[in-house]
């Protein structure tokens, strides 16, 4: 194994093993839910696709949260968010919300690109079938005369 990938692998393993588990969990679920509601309500008026994605995302999160509560995995105490956050975290939260706002033209993902490509191929196939059907009708009309 080359030394650079080995060093990167060791570094990533060491860094990921020293992350405290509390940093990976939300501190206040009501804060997360209200932020999720804000994000979904802001993007819901854009178009039908964002509405459907928002609905599916909300259903998934509610189902996932319900499953976690039922299995007893989720044991987070309910603390007020103001006591847990420092002023530095408040400013970083504001920066994050500014950064996460939707742009006017969102980037096209690979899934969307492949979906559009499949639709274009299907439309071309349908057009070819229509042209072939027109030619077949024309040949049958000439042979029938």
From Swiss-Prot:
Pfam families (alphabetical): CRF
InterPro entries for the chain: Corticotropin-releasing_fac_CS, CRF, Urocortin_CRF
Domain of life the protein comes from: Eukaryota
Localization: Secreted
Iron is among the record's keywords: no
Predominant location: secreted
Keywords for the protein's UniProt record, in alphabetical order: Amidation, Cleavage on pair of basic residues, Hormone, Secreted, Signal
GO molecular function: hormone activity
GO cellular component terms, A-Z: extracellular region
Family named by the database record: Belongs to the sauvagine/corticotropin-releasing factor/urotensin I family.
Stated role: Urotensin is found in the teleost caudal neurosecretory system. It has a suggested role in osmoregulation and as a corticotropin-releasing factor. The non-hormonal portion of this precursor may be a urotensin binding protein, urophysin.
The protein's name in its UniProt record: UI
Organism, scientific name: Carassius auratus
